[in-house]
Amino acid sequence: MSKRPISVEELIGKSQSAEVISKPKFLSKSERQKLSLQRNQEIQDKKRQQSTVNNGAKKRYNNSIEDNPEPKKINKKLKKGRNFNFDWDEEEDTSNNYQPLVRYDNRTNPPDLGLSDMHWSEKQIDDMTTRDWRIFKEDYNITSKGGDIENPLRCWAESKLPAKLLNILIKNLGYDSPTPIQRASIPLALNGRDIVGIAETGSGKTLAFLLPLFSYILSVDSNYLLYEHQQESNFNKPLGLILAPTRELALQITKEAKLFGDKLNLNVVTIIGGHQYEETVHSVRNGVHIVVATPGRLIDSLERGIINLSNCYFFTMDEADKMIDMGFEKSLQSILNYLPASEKLETTIDGKIFNIKKRITLMFTATISPPIEKITKNYLMKPGYLFIGNVGEAVDNINQQFEYFGARQSSDEILDPKKLDKLFSILRFHKDENRNYSIIIFANFKKACEELAYELSRKGFSDNTVIHGSKSQEARERAIDSFREGKDKILIATDVAARGIDIPNVSLVVNYQMTKKFDEYIHRIGRTGRAGNKGTSCTFIDDGDSEVFLDLKKFLNKGKKKCPEWLLKHSSTQSQILRD
């Protein structure tokens, strides 16, 4: 039986009651406060009832542990108030009665670990132990030999450099902390020790010898510097000499030296090929304190009497291994013979004027070869050997890539279509992936550099420039400045022309032709990945380069880099395995 429908009267009644319920009722302020107090009282009553039950259990638990618990002292300074308000009662917090075995506040009384447990960076230099220095050297990958090697430099403030030199270094030039080669070599050089520094290009060697050199000159008798050195008979007698293998490196060193020299009122002169002798004569007319030179032009200047090294007791050879490779071994020996002997300091007044007991000779090199050892033995006195990093091993921050072309197909490998197409492809990809790119392309011959520049311009890479030995000095300087300033994005160069050039932020190095000497491969790829930056190298290689395959394999294995499959399977590397 179906249910009867609702009557009209009932329907009207429900509608009226719903309207009453839905219509808001406005209360006065006093009524709202009264209602709020009533609700809060009901909540507190419920909490109090629940707390009575919990407190009974809590007291029974506390009495079973300790009859008279000691009240916990609270540091008023630390307890500024509760950060959170939970639903339960504060009396329910059992952590207030926690009794630690040892009372200790981490925030107010840090533990005294003792000097032996502190890291070397947290200690004063006088508190450093033998173990601390060993850890310090490991941190910066510094090793040494030669006996009585002084501890490295922890920071500029702890060095013995003159205050005015430190002020220029830190405040004016912004050198916050030393590099590993600077940490290791500066303390030795400041104490007059001869040094053989083995470090790669780009490790900060320039400051490693410039700072001790300027420090030495500032220690020379002030009356000599102000008066006697200014006499016409001493105008061409430098107090320090720096030799570099190439003109570009010499100019680079000069530029950095003048940052200090100009502020210290010391004259720095460059003697390199490509400049007229009259320019050198004019440069030393007002006196010279430091000479930066290449070996060949310096010997010419010495023979012509333009320069006199009789007062030069501070001598530096930068990239000495490269000077030997370029055939300057005899020139180096001749220059060393022009320098005054240490005995002169003992037998004349020079010892008091120049404030040293022996001539100081610094030599920086990437490798130790027999000619380097010969020069060291004959001309350096009990040198300290400083090894920075793993010289000769693969650089971790350089991604080394290879393009293997198998057997050499074309007699003219420069214009090989496959190699050119691959080069264009690599350059386009790198350009698209890197907004601020800077690329160096190495070739073995001057003609190859010129042909590559022409082909690149044809394919839309007109922002390239070329340097090689046949370029005039002015043209080479102009090309390097243009590349360094970013006007040209691609530099095409031979090894000799590019050795020692410090171009920051090179993002890609392309070895369009593999070098015949494997050491040069290391120097080439070292143009990128400097100062902690990541870099990429790409090397074009074929069977015609098999004479360096074994060295390349050893180099990659030693640096824990992945060897390409073609290199592992090549006959030139397999035959060595059988012999071993």
Curated annotation (Swiss-Prot):
Q: Which UniProt keywords apply?
A: ATP-binding, Cytoplasm, Helicase, Hydrolase, mRNA processing, mRNA splicing, Nucleotide-binding, Nucleus
Q: Which organism is it from?
A: Debaryomyces hansenii (strain ATCC 36239 / CBS 767 / BCRC 21394 / JCM 1990 / NBRC 0083 / IGC 2968)
Localization, per the record, is: Cytoplasm; Nucleus
Indicate the enzyme's highest-level EC class: hydrolase
The GO annotation for biological process reads:
mRNA processing; RNA splicing
Q: Which gene encodes it?
A: PRP28
Q: Does the keyword Translocase apply?
A: no
Quaternary structure, per UniProt, is:
Component of the U5 snRNP complex.
Disulfide cross-links: none
Write down what this protein is called. Answer: Pre-mRNA-splicing ATP-dependent RNA helicase PRP28
* Residue ranges of the motif Q motif: 154-183
Span(s) of short sequence motif DEAD box: 318-321
Q: Where is this region: Disordered?
A: 23-75
Catalysis performed (reactions): ATP + H2O = ADP + phosphate + H(+)
Matching entries from SUPFAM superfamilies are given as:
P-loop containing nucleoside triphosphate hydrolases (SSF52540)
Give the principal location in a single coarse category.
Answer: cytoplasm
GO function terms (MF aspect):
ATP binding; ATP hydrolysis activity; nucleic acid binding; RNA helicase activity
Q: Which family does it belong to?
A: Belongs to the DEAD box helicase family. DDX23/PRP28 subfamily.
Residues covered by the Helicase ATP-binding domain: 186-386
What is stated about domains? Answer: The Q motif is unique to and characteristic of the DEAD box family of RNA helicases and controls ATP binding and hydrolysis.
Q: What is its EC number?
A: 3.6.4.13
